[in-house]
């Protein structure tokens, strides 16, 4: 082996004293020179090219790795789809969640509205009771006032009819006659009583409606009542 080292070293250096050099250093130098020759020698271009060609699929393998990463990414995303969906929902909930101040304000507003509703119901009941009481009092006062008016009207009528000029005016006679006739129930005199309440004096006034036909009908009924 020493001779081999010496041969290689002698072939490299071409000096006879190269056999005395360190064999390890000579071996390392030989290996480095061979490696340099392999890299720079044109005779080995094709293998280098073939090696480069073998190394060429590197980007393809990288692309396949990228594709695999993409596929794996899709698979990973699909596998973690529910988790990502839950995360998105949670994020949306956080975004749509009301702030604490608004939540407190809304709660206070709700309590305030409930208190107002309760107070309004109590007030409505009080107003109903008060209105019912006022209506009863008004009905009572109205009834008392009606009775007082009746009594006062009777007194006024009695005093009026006792006047000395009452007969001249004709109120008493007409009143008594009307009352007397109204109490009498004689068959066939109904239209006569109706005719007594009507004014058959013709009046030529533009503001009054023409009731001549009605007047003539009443007169005919008074003269010839309807036969039953």
Curated annotation (Swiss-Prot):
Modification Phosphoserine occurs at: 11, 13, 216
Record-level Gene Ontology MF annotations: clathrin heavy chain binding; structural molecule activity
Region entry Involved in binding clathrin heavy chain, spans: 92-154
Domain of life where this protein originates: Eukaryota
Disulphide connectivity of cysteines: 198-208
CC terms in the record's Gene Ontology section: clathrin coat; clathrin coat of coated pit; clathrin coat of trans-Golgi network vesicle; clathrin vesicle coat; plasma membrane; synaptic vesicle membrane
Feature: compositional bias, Low complexity: 1-17
Positions of post-translational Blocked amino end (Met) modification: 1
Family, per entry: Belongs to the clathrin light chain family.
Listed name of the protein: Clathrin light chain B
Protein encoded by which gene: CLTB
């Amino acid at each position: 082996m020493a001779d081999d080292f010496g041969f290689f070293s002698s072939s490299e250096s071409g000096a006879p004293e190269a056999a005395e050099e360190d064999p390890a250093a000579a071996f390392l130098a030989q290996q480095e020179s061979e490696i340099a020759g392999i890299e720079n020698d044109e005779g080995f271009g094709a293998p280098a090219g073939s090696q480069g060609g073998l190394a060429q699929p590197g980007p393809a393998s990288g692309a396949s790795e990228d594709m695999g990463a993409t596929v794996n990414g899709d698979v990973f995303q699909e596998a973690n789809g529910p988790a990502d969906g839950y995360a998105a929902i949670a994020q949306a909930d956080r975004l749509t969640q009301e702030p604490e101040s608004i939540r407190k304000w809304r709660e206070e507003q709700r309590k305030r509205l409930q208190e107002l509703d309760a107070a309004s119901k109590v007030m409505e009941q009080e107003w109903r009771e008060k209105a019912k009481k006022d209506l009863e009092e008004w009905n009572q006062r109205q009834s008392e006032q009606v009775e007082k008016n009746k009594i006062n009207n009777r007194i006024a009528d009695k005093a009026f009819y006792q006047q000395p000029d009452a007969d001249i005016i004709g109120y008493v006679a007409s009143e008594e006659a009307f009352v007397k006739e109204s109490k009498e129930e004689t068959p066939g005199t109904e239209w006569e009583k109706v005719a007594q309440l009507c004014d058959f004096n013709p009046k030529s006034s533009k503001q009054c409606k023409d009731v001549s036909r009605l007047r003539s009908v009443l007169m005919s009924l008074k003269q010839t009542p309807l036969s039953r």
